[in-house]
Structures are given as C-alpha cells and as structure tokens.
C-alpha cells in the first residue's frame, strides 16, 4: 500500500492509501476529494489537473498538458497510476464546483423579483397561493386522577375538536417530544400540521408562547448545478437562497456517465450521497445558519430535476433510462420523506417531486413550463431550458409538445477547457474589438475579481464575437493572426481572453478550437431540436410569438449573440425573454401553492412528448446546424447582414 496525499491551496491535506496501479482519480473519489472530471475520467476534458509535489506517478502524456506544464509537474489525475508514495496539489479550479457554494444576498431585489413576478402571474391565472400546512394553537385540560387519558390521545382529542377529522397521525418524532412540551407549556401548544379533507398529520409541537415559522425547501437539482430556496410556507417569503455545484460531477458531466457509474458496486449509494450528503445537506446547513433558522422546522420539500437526477436522488436504478425502450421507474411519485433519503430537515418532511414527462424530459421542465405561462396564452410560444440536457416545450393554451436533445454540459462550462459554472471568477459577458482583437469582459463577483474561466453566457459571447469580427470562420477555425491568437505545435488554434498575469488562475483563460467545436455541437443540438419539433407540427419559426429562455448559465444571455452563432432562430429580438432558473422558480411555486402543484401535474399529463431519435430528419438537421450560424445561411439573414456591416 502507498500513501497518497492530496494538498489544497488553502494548506489543508487529505491522506488516502492505494495499491500499485490504482488510478489517481479513483483514489481521490474514494477519499471524497473533489476533482472535476466532466468526462468521467476518460482523458477527454483535461479538467482533472493536479500538480505533482512529491513522489512519483505513472502518467500518460496528453494534449491537455503541454511539455512545459508536464515538466512543472502537472498531470491529469485520470491518466495517472500510483507507483509509490505521492503528494499532489489539487488546485482550486479543479474543485471549484464544490468549493464555491454561494448563499445569495437577499437584500438585492433582483434575487427575489423573479419569484414575486411568478407568484403574481400564476395568481392572475386563477391559481391560489395556498397550501395544506398550518399552525394550530390547542389548549387542553391538564390530566388528573379523574382524567388519565394518555398524552397522544389528549392531543388528538383536542385537535379533533378543532377540525372534525377522523384520522389524525402523530409520528414518533412528535411522540418523543410530547410529554415534555405538554407539561412545560401547561398543555397549551402550537402544532404544525398538514391537513387534507380526510386526515391530519402532526409534524411538530411547540409551547403556545413560541413564534413558529413553517419552513419549506425548494430545490432544483441540475446535472451541473444545484440551487435552493428556503421559504416561509405561510407567506411565501424567501428566507434564504443558495447554489452549489452538483457533487456528482466528479463521476461525469452528463447523465449517461452518471448512470454508468451508478451500476458499479455501491454506485447508486455513491451518486445519492454525492448529491444529498455532499451538496444539498451542506446547502441546507449554510442557509439555516445564515438566518439562524432551525433545520428541523423545514416540513416540506419540493424537488425539480431531470428524470435521471430524480432517480439518482431517490437512490433508484436509472439504468433502464439509457437503453431502449428508455423506461423510467416513475414519472410521478409522492411517497418520499426526508428520512428515506437522508435529507437533514424534519425527518417526517414530505418530499414532492415535479412530475417527469419522458425519459429525458423531467420535472425541471414541467416546473419551468408552469413559470413560462405558455399554457395560459393563446399565442404560440417556445420555452427552452439551456442545461446539460437541452429541453424544449412549444405550444399555447390549446396544446403543448416537448422534446429533449443531448446538448452536453457546454452551456454550464463543461466540455470547455476553461469552462466553469456562473460563480465568482467566471467571465459572463465579452466583446471583442474587430480592429485590435482586444477583449473587454465582465466577471462574476465583487469589483476587482479576476477571471478564472468562462461560464455559459460568456462562452456564447466570445464565440459570437470571434465569428462576427472574422477571427474564426463558420467551422470555428481561426483565420486571423494576432497577439491573442496562437497555435500549438499540433496546429490547434486558441484565443486568449485573459493572460495568466491578468487572471486569477494558474494558466491563461482561453478558448480553443476544440472548445468551439464542442460548443457548436451543443448549440447545433438546440437549433436542430427546434427545427425538428416545429417541422413535425408544420410550423415555421416565423410563427413563434415569444421565446422564453431559462437556465442558470449567467446573469442573462445576450440573445443577439445566441442568434449570431445559430443557437436560436433569426427572429426579432424583442420576442426573446430570459426567465432565469425557471426550474427552481417552478419548484418554489409548487412548494408554496397546492393548486400550483396540481396544475404542474396537469401540464405533465397533457403534454405530448416527441422522441427526437425516432424522427428520420433529426440527424440531418443536427449536422446542418453544426456550423456558425448554419450551413444554410438563408435561415439567418440578419446575422449575415450585420457581419457584412462590421
């Protein structure tokens, strides 16, 4: 056995032991060391970079590590085997997805405006903002020798007087508290309850003098990013908001790699722990700590995620999803409780899940569709959720059709050499001067934050600017020379947005021809899915009245740039609307409003699912879309006209 020491830039270390020949990335995973590996350790992405500080490794040479970097000790963890005791440095950029959990500043009106707008819109559509949770104050006669009724029956009798229900359930967690709370309060208590027409469930019990807030948790589990809000269930007020990288990402950037990993011995538990123990629970703790809110007072949770994430969250085998005929274990389920999956809130908290529509169109889309309001408008609208799985819904108040395309993780920074989530240090907007080829960019974070990488919106801007200024051609190849354009000894071109001395990372922030090619395929998947779905309905893009774009890829997408690269159709820009993380907003509405929850189930039931792989023309559409903006430039007249003017 050899000792493997993982050192971090903050000075901390983690030690593990491994056998000769063990893969370094697998050793890191076993030691719970977070190293970003979107390609699941296939050597394709180049993101699992570590620096050899002592000892030896048997490492394969790779195009992702230059000779200069190799001589400085840089290696890919997935391409390295243990041969002796070794110490490696794990740079912050390699574990950024985990280390950069962020609790939002709710003093900013922008953070809550989108939720308030969504509440107003669904309420205007006749959906009441009410739910089944309540606080009931109960006063009981104290026991005596003449009244020896046990505590639980005494409470049940009092509650039944308040609401004439036949079935009242008091769980073990409340039963444990009952003797002390009743006597300390002199039998005057407040109960947190869930009431239906037939029964009541008692979640908690307090002294009647206490102020009791009913907490609720809405969570969007994205393949790359997890976002959550903690709310007051009675008022709908957002108490705290947080986001973090999905801890599962070290097992692969896409759902297929995650499913494959889950089939290994102990795999389902590893994937479930990565998203719950390593991601969601720390987010809960941090949100509650920031506002001094008891975690045990979160009594309800709503999860919105794609179909695969739903299964992995629940610890259910997802393997049938990747094989024909692509059958999930469930589309809808209401049988989960916090204690079932290890969510560290009230153990009896009920977990509701936004319903899935198909094997690759999940609850995140039904929740987002609720927010988009296309179901309440006569105009034809298109809803697009930009994530690792690109999902679309088209329709109006009469019909809706959905489909999914495998866009890959590029929109959230995956498959891009300097890609990252939209967190501190991410370049989220960029322009390039045509004459000087010099960039001007905006970085996520406080003023003065140095760039570390590119998030989705920044990638869109950079590629658009490179194309519109003639630095790259429609194939994404560099055709102009300059200080920031360079080619390696293999001939691969790249453009440097921030040199190492300008950046907050250990290398230049750049975008390569391989990155551009990966992104062209991602945007091509979106555009070809739009064309295929519209063609199946005999619709033309000119018939689209509004396009609602969702996804946590930055503070907002420059819609003009998205059209320039051929990701969205060439229609008037005023038709595009960015609605942020609609999955989280929809989960919030479902959590706060039982009628909104019911409406979401109705939307899922009434939506037609189009399986793109069964459409003969889809692959032709995809191949045609893998140019900037498209092989058929007549589809993008305004883009070609503007490029000529520049």
For the regions a protein language model found, what residue spans apply to each?
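Short glycine-rich phosphate-binding loop at a beta-alpha junction
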Residues: 138, 295-306, 463, 541-551
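A contiguous, well-structured pocket-lining segment that forms one wall/lid of small-molecule binding clefts
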Residues: 467-537
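N-terminal phosphate-binding loop and adjacent alpha-helix
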Residues: 247-289, 415, 426-431, 518, ...
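Short glycine/threonine-rich loop-to-helix capping motif typified by GTGT followed
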Residues: 306-320, 491, 539, 551-570, ...
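Local cysteine-cluster metal-coordination motifs and their immediate loop/turn environment
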Residues: 34-59, 67-84
């Amino acid at each position: 056995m050899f000792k493997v020491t993982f050192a971090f830039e903050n000075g901390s270390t983690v030690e593990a032991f491994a056998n000769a020949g063990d893969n370094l990335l697998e050793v890191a995973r076993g030691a719970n060391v977070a190293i970003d590996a979107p390609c699941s350790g296939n050597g394709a992405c180049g993101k699992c970079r570590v620096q050899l500080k002592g000892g030896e490794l048997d490492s394969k040479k790779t195009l992702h590590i230059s000779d200069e970097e190799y001589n400085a000790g840089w290696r890919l963890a997935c391409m390295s085997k243990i041969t002796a005791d070794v110490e490696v440095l794990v740079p912050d950029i390699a574990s950024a997805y985990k280390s950069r959990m962020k609790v939002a500043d709710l003093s900013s009106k922008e953070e809550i405006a989108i939720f308030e707008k969504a509440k107003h819109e669904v309420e205007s559509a006749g959906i009441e903002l009410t739910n089944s949770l309540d606080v009931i104050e109960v006063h009981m006669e104290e026991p005596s020798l003449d009244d020896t009724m046990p505590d639980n029956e005494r409470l049940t009798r009092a509650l039944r007087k308040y609401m004439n229900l036949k079935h009242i359930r008091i769980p073990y967690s409340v039963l444990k508290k009952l003797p002390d709370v009743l006597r300390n309060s002199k039998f005057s208590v407040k109960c947190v309850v869930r009431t239906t027409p037939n029964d009541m469930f008692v979640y908690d019990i307090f002294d009647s003098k206490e102020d009791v807030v009913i907490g609720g948790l809405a969570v969007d589990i994205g393949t790359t990013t997890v976002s959550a809000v903690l709310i007051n269930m009675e008022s709908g007020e957002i108490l705290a908001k947080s986001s973090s990288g999905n801890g599962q990402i070290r097992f692969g950037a896409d759902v297929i790699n995650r499913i494959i990993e889950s089939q290994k011995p102990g795999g389902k538990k590893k994937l479930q722990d990565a998203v719950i123990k390593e991601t969601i629970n720390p987010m809960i703790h941090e949100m509650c700590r920031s506002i001094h809110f008891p975690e045990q007072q979160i009594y309800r949770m709503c999860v919105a995620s794609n179909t695969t994430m739903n299964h992995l969250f629940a610890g259910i085998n997802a393997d049938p999803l990747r094989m024909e005929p692509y059958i999930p274990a469930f589309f809808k389920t209401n049988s989960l409780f916090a204690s079932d999956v290890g969510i560290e809130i009230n153990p009896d908290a009920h977990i509701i899940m936004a319903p899935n529509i198909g094997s690759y169109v999940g609850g995140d889309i039904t929740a987002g569709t609720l927010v988009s309001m296309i179901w309440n408008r006569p105009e034809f609208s298109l809803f697009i959720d930009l994530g690792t799985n690109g999902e679309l819904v088209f329709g109006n108040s009469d019909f809706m059709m959905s489909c999914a395309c495998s866009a890959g993780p590029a929109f959230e920074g995956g498959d891009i050499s300097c890609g990252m989530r939209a967190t501190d240090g991410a370049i989220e907007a960029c322009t390039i001067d045509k004459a000087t080829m010099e960039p001007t960019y905006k970085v996520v974070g406080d003023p003065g934050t140095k760039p570390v990488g590119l998030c989705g919106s920044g990638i869109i801007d950079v590629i658009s600017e490179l194309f519109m200024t003639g630095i790259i051609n429609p194939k994404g190849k560099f055709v102009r020379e300059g200080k920031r354009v360079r080619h390696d000894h293999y001939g691969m071109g790249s453009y440097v947005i921030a040199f190492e001395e300008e950046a907050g990372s250990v290398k230049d922030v750049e975008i390569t021809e391989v990155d551009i090619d990966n992104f062209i395929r991602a945007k091509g998947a979106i555009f070809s899915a739009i064309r295929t779905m519209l063609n199946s309905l005999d619709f033309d893009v000119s018939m689209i009245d509004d396009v609602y774009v969702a996804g946590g890829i930055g503070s907002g997408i420059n819609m003009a740039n998205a059209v320039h690269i051929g990701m969205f159709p060439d229609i008037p820009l005023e038709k595009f609307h960015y609605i942020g993380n609609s999955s989280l907003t929809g989960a919030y509405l479902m959590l706060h409003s039982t009628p909104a929850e019911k409406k979401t189930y109705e939307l899922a039931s009434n939506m037609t699912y189009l399986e793109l792989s069964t459409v003969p023309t889809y692959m032709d559409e995809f191949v045609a879309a893998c140019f900037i903006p498209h092989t058929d430039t007549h589809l993008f007249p305004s883009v070609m006209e503007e490029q000529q003017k520049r």
